[in-house]
Swiss-Prot record:
The DNA-dependent RNA polymerase used for intermediate and late genes expression consists of eight subunits 147 kDa, 133 kDa, 35 kDa, 30 kDa, 22 kDa, 19 kDa, 18 kDa and 7 kDa totalling more than 500 kDa in mass. The same holoenzyme, with the addition of the transcription-specificity factor RAP94, is used for early gene expression. One of its GO terms (molecular function) is DNA-directed RNA polymerase activity. It catalyses: RNA(n) + a ribonucleoside 5'-triphosphate = RNA(n+1) + diphosphate. Keywords: DNA-directed RNA polymerase, Early protein, Nucleotidyltransferase, Transcription, Transferase, Virion. It is found in: Virion. Its EC number is 2.7.7.6. This is DNA-directed RNA polymerase 7 kDa subunit. InterPro entries: RNA_pol_7kDa_chordopoxvir (IPR008448). One of its GO terms (cellular component) is DNA-directed RNA polymerase complex. Belongs to the poxviridae DNA-directed RNA polymerase 7 kDa subunit family. Part of the DNA-dependent RNA polymerase which catalyzes the transcription of viral DNA into RNA using the four ribonucleoside triphosphates as substrates. Responsible for the transcription of early, intermediate and late genes. DNA-dependent RNA polymerase associates with the early transcription factor (ETF) thereby allowing the early genes transcription. Late transcription, and probably also intermediate transcription, require newly synthesized RNA polymerase. Induction: Expressed in the early phase of the viral replicative cycle.
């Protein structure tokens, strides 16, 4: 599952590019060939999060 990613500058949905990076394991250089806006290219290059660890840890009881 890939969380939606929208460019905050131009409003373009770049979830498909993020899917290609995280799930399909396509190189960043290859994915950026199809992205024209510099703002979207920058966001994809710098703000891609690693896959999240969804394990739940118990809360600590401080009392």
């Amino acid at each position: 599952m890939v969380f939606q990613l929208v460019c905050s500058t131009c409003g373009r949905d770049i979830s498909e590019e993020r899917y290609a990076l995280l799930i399909k394991k396509i190189d960043l250089k290859t994915v950026l060939r199809g992205v024209k806006n510099n703002c979207c290219r920058l966001k994809l290059s710098t703000q891609i999060e690693p896959q999240r660890n969804l394990t739940v840890e118990p809360l600590l009881d401080i009392n």
